[in-house]
Swiss-Prot record:
InterPro entries reported in the protein's UniProt record: MetI-like, MetI-like_sf
Primary localization: membrane
PANTHER family: ABC TRANSPORTER PERMEASE PROTEIN MG189-RELATED-RELATED, OSMOPROTECTIVE COMPOUNDS UPTAKE PERMEASE PROTEIN GGTD
Transmembrane segments: 26-46, 97-117, 126-146, 158-178, 207-227, 231-251, 263-283
Listed PROSITE patterns: ABC_TM1 (PS50928)
Description of what induces expression: Expression is very low in cells grown in basal medium but increases significantly after a salt shock.
Subcellular location: Cell membrane
Organism: Synechocystis sp. (strain ATCC 27184 / PCC 6803 / Kazusa)
Name the record gives this protein: Osmoprotective compounds uptake permease protein GgtD
Assembly and oligomerization: The complex is composed of two ATP-binding proteins (GgtA), two transmembrane proteins (GgtC and GgtD) and a solute-binding protein (GgtB).
Record GO cellular component, one term: plasma membrane
Domain ABC transmembrane type-1: 91-283
Keyword Cell membrane belongs to the record: yes
Name of encoding gene: ggtD
Length: 298
């Protein structure tokens, strides 16, 4: 009996060692990709903590030659960014833009996704194909035509105009992602609710929305990060004036007309990350589930 147990233990140890060596190349590849992906952010963060003269004379990696030398680190860049004129107002403008530009497309995309998944109407599949095709249309091709329309309607330079623009640009992805998820919900559950006399509105509010929270949260993260980090759309439709300028425009203005204060961008980039990181970590538990379900299920 003892010999059999010892033999089994040796077999298990051998199997574990074999499995370890088989998976070692995969682990090395994953760690290498993670290192390469993280390296630019690490360099940006270290640069944000260095004086301008050091950034001009030496590379950021030189801090590792004397890692315990505290005097080589400098917080003045963050102070300069926070004390710059209009930064507080820019944060409020970014929130004013990002929150409605996230909530509005979520509401519209969820309704549309339910209609594509569970309602029958003429041309449903063709219309959904057209929505998917919009995913590959570059938004840059729409900037000038839409801006001309905005100028005629008086929407240029207003928050409403940029809300509508971000809603239009985000809807194709939202509808595609949510339709795949909602369409994979149990058919028996939807049919049972319909047999009990529930209307489409009641099914949508009582069943679809609660069950689709992972996908909705995933799209919310994508949309919020896109809107918060956007510079081009805000610059075109808002014009860059101080009273409506978001953080991205304010950071670009910090550099100066000739780029002489470029070093402030390192600190400004990390300051602007605070709100998106809070949103991401707040919805993180839904994020992976929503992405996997929306892309794998059919």
């Amino acid at each position: 009996m003892t010999k059999a147990v010892n033999k089994s233990n040796r077999t298990n140890n051998t199997n574990r060692k074999t499995e370890f060596w088989q998976k070692l190349p995969i682990h090395i590849a994953i760690l290498t990709i993670a290192f390469i992906w993280t390296l630019p952010s690490l360099g940006l963060f270290i640069s944000s903590l260095r004086p301008r003269g050091d950034m001009l004379s030496t590379g950021w990696w030189t801090v590792f030659w004397h890692p315990l030398e505290i005097t080589q680190f400098y917080l003045g860049n963050y102070g300069d960014v926070l004390r710059s004129s209009g930064m507080g107002e820019a944060f409020l403008n970014s929130l004013t833009i990002a929150v409605p530009a996230t909530v509005i497309p979520i509401a519209i995309a969820t309704f549309a996704a339910y209609a594509f998944a569970w309602m029958t109407f003429p041309g449903r599949q063709l219309l959904f194909i057209l929505v998917v095709c919009l995913l590959v249309v570059p938004l840059q091709t729409t900037l000038i035509p839409v801006l001309r329309v905005y100028a005629q309607l008086g929407l240029a330079g207003t928050f409403l105009g940029v809300w509508l623009a971000h809603t239009a640009y985000g809807l194709p992805l939202g509808i595609y992602l949510l339709r795949n998820y909602i369409g994979a919900l149990p058919k028996d559950l939807i049919e049972a609710a319909a047999v009990d006399g529930a209307s489409h509105l009641k099914i949508f509010t009582k069943l679809i929305v609660p069950l689709s929270m992972p996908a909705i949260a995933s799209f919310a993260v994508f949309q919020f990060l896109w809107v918060w980090n956007d510079l081009l759309v805000a610059l075109v439709y808002l014009g860059g004036t101080a009273d409506v300028a978001p953080v991205t425009i304010q950071l670009s203005n910090l550099v100066g007309s000739r780029g002489q204060d470029w070093y402030l961008l390192t600190a400004g980039a990390f300051i602007s990350m605070i709100v998106p990181l809070m949103v991401f970590f707040g919805l993180q538990r839904y994020f992976v589930r929503g992405i996997l379900a929306g892309s794998v299920k059919s």
